[in-house]
Amino acid sequence: MQQALFGGGCFWCVEAVFLQIRGVEKVTSGYAGGHTTHPTYEQVCQGDTQHAEVVLIDFDEQQVTYSQLLDVFFATHDPTTLNRQGNDIGTQYRSVIYYFNEEQKQAAEHTIQTLKDDDLDIVTELSPAPTFYPAEDYHQNYYEKNPSQGYCNFAIPPKLLKLYSKFQHLMKDQ
């Protein structure tokens, strides 16, 4: 089993996307990249911890590759806006890839360069994986548990539509 660690705005949205991908065994919402140990959601939202909202993805590389996960990541959030995803503004919503090994770093660098070659101004941070802190239990599988919640209804369906239209070949059998 391999792991990927991505931040692309609100972790509820990113989690909802990656739970649809074949070979993804588990997605854990959490925090990484800051200076506070065991931060709370409230602390991260205040912006003082410097943590990003991230998802830790456990995946089977025999079913989905890290590069394919990168493609999904970049297609389902805005990697060109610094510290912002839609109406969510703050460093906790930054676009970030934390890599666990040199192969992941190189794959991410290649994907970012390909997007830049297409004239996209990518602001995604690329850094070694720091300590990951799981978010509080009520954040886990949030969209699955709260599909009619207002924010979720606004932010997540457009991401899922993009996912379904561009990555049908990577979707879990329903």
From Swiss-Prot:
User: Where does the sequence pass through the membrane?
Assistant: none
Query: Which InterPro entries does this chain map to?
Result: Met_Sox_Rdtase_MsrA_dom (IPR002569), Met_Sox_Rdtase_MsrA_sf (IPR036509)
- What GO biological process term is on the record, naming one? protein modification process
Single GO MF descriptor? peptide-methionine (S)-S-oxide reductase activity
Specify whether ATP-binding is a keyword of the entry.
no
Entry keyword Coiled coil: no
Question: According to the UniProt entry, what is the EC number of this protein?
Answer: 1.8.4.11
Keywords for the protein's UniProt record, in alphabetical order: Oxidoreductase
What catalytic reaction does the record list? L-methionyl-[protein] + [thioredoxin]-disulfide + H2O = L-methionyl-(S)-S-oxide-[protein] + [thioredoxin]-dithiol; [thioredoxin]-disulfide + L-methionine + H2O = L-methionine (S)-S-oxide + [thioredoxin]-dithiol
Active site located where?
C10
**Chain's role:** Has an important function as a repair enzyme for proteins that have been inactivated by oxidation. Catalyzes the reversible oxidation-reduction of methionine sulfoxide in proteins to methionine.
Similarity comment text for this entry: Belongs to the MsrA Met sulfoxide reductase family.
**Name of the protein:** Peptide methionine sulfoxide reductase MsrA
Q: Give the species this sequence originates from.
A: Acinetobacter baumannii (strain SDF)
